């Protein structure tokens, strides 16, 4: 069935159900960053395969909203579909909410599957529609009626994290959550975000692309926990571990009926940013809601000593794999064979190096491997259509990561494939200076992202340059690779949570020259407590990624003495930690690649 036919069939169903506008976002029932095959309804209906976008269909119009990462791809994939590309954030382009508000008729009906729309978004739409006496019909998955060969929900087996990996029992975590529930005056807490359930109960799965998470909902009561999940994914051992904490296993979709039984005296703690609109709408009127962030969001962001130890071990494996990869690239340049490789083949080779390390589970996100001008596209995703051959005297940006049994990694390196231009060297060096400034920063407890971001961006700002993305984000422990609540960005709205010892974040400044090259240099960093004195508790960042920077891409004359000290200190650590994991030839290369400057 062609895309035009699918849209026509959708309009037939809309007319049958009295729906004027139907919205299809990119989401699963848990607002996950990546979604499994079953949830790719927007891809099925539009033909657009990018990871972000929303399809809105009226009786005579269809539009696909996506951001700048995907404009070119969307243009190609939407051609001939009858769907207009709506370029988000471009002047004159309304948001989906603004479009719906303007185009819904008086007394009209907006339809969507309320399980894939957040409580917050659904509530906003509901408020906006009141001006036209319009309503929402949220219990309608019209795409499901069209998608005849829709993939089933994942049936992959779950696994359990023992305390030697998790560092804390589920019993202890539940005690902490119930304490916060009590302080909030709540006797029930609904958790729909997969990483929060995974952390709380020490369970993981393979139900979401790139993230080792389990499709599930959790409802925490004062004396037991209801876990809504496909029970066939659990071994007897997992069931026994859950039973110790009075976890009652129920069918995955039963939550939508069960919450209708909440009583008027119940007080329910919900996170509006994570709860889906269908669950919110099924909670009976009269039940009091306490709207605040899930307690687990901050709890899981502060890693315990066991998690930190395991994360560092994962980074040693990742560091060995990525160092082998850079050595492989440099040898291909030396032999004149680099042009035989492409972005996609190099990405596959890097993944193979990771697989060889042992304990590899899967990539932690869709790899970004951009050669030359493709490196200037911040969230570039190589495809058969865009795949470039690697050529000499250019830069190759690789932003990749892995989930190992001990933890998750996220690293970016930009590699010089031979002799590069003075401009490229200058740009690489400035970005490295941004990175080093943040790495060596010492600051007081209570400081948050906007404060430290000013230091990171300064070397570029002095030259009136910048990058249009955050300098850093939190990283989950076998959870989401982009984890809140802390981040590093000058925008207060995006990173207000103060840093706390035990948090793991990224340090990833960049510079992007359209049509020429892109540079991003990323390590993961651990927030560590240092001196405590009459002025307060001081913190610092410890790099926990162990891969050399590219000395062939650095203009040493631009480095300050502090830069050189920090660079040499880091390179000594990289050599000491990674050299034992390499072959004799690789070790000799690494010795030279980490020489003092």
PLM features: what roles do these ranges have?
Residues 1-597:
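Active-site neighborhoods and metal-handling regions in enzymes and metal-associated proteins
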